[in-house]
Amino acid sequence: AGFQHTCGITNSPTNSEPFGGALMCWGFNQKGQAKPPAGTFIQVSCGMFHSCALSIDEHIKCWGAQGIGASPEGEFLQVSCGNFHTCAILKDGHLKCWGKNYDNQVTDAPTDGNFVQVTSGKTHNCAIKKDGSLHCWGSNNRGEIQHPQGYQFIQVSASQWHHTCGITVDHELLCWGADGFGQCSDVPEGMQFTMVSTGRKYSCGILANGTSTCWGQKIQNYGMDQPPGNNTWAQISAGYMHNCGITNEGDSLCWGQDTGGQSS
């Protein structure tokens, strides 16, 4: 889920590949961000006005706003779109970032390797190494890169505003940075999490039992506080003011702001 568009991968492999699928995007398309390329893809990420996806042959294809959405050379493991920049992990474990560089979120990327996950936010990024160590860089206007010390992380998510959340190896959820709407201080306590996704000024997470909860900003009845129904979830993606998730039954559901059809 991005600013006002959403992309996903169908569960029907193309070109007789054993996994992966075709891309589908919906919502606002003023820069072409919701018009994906053809092919078989295994991962997709949405930014403000661009999107990028990892193909089954380990190449990245980006579309949308020119320059911001340029497709890089090389073979990759994962890609993450920020608001106006993108970071990805090369097959050798090194990081590559490109796009707008307002707060050195592109040029200050660590130059060593062994990274296994990267996340890009408004103007900051965080990445996890194989040993669970967390590294963040870029904007620190609200403390969004001042992560807690002494923890090993298994997953991290940088928001489209100024906060970050991560899950430790003990499945504890930690958040830091901007907290004007409780997006860090209202984190559910005493619960184990398997996944977290940060929106603009809110976050959503999947609990160990498969249920999900959201916390932080609740505005204009966009419904960002709780996912719909009594579902268990395989994945959730928080956007600017909307969310989409995949249930354990394989259904795709979206909720929140729908001004451009990004939730419908």
Regions picked out by a protein language model, each given a short descriptive name:
Residues 5, 33, 43, 50, ...:
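Intrinsically disordered, low-complexity repeat/linker tracts enriched for polar/charged residues
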Residues 24-38, 63-74, 84, 98-111, ...:
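Short glycine/serine- and acidic-residue-enriched loop/turn motifs that recur at repeat junctions
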Residues 43-45, 78-80, 91-94, 130:
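Thr-biased low-complexity repeat/linker tracts and other Thr-enriched repetitive architectures
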Residues 5-8, 25, 50-53, 62, ...:
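Conserved core positions of repeat-based scaffolds
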Residues 13-20:
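Intrinsically disordered, low-complexity Ser/Thr- and acidic-rich flexible linkers and loops
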Residues 10, 29, 55, 90, ...:
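Acidic surface patches and DE-rich sequence motifs
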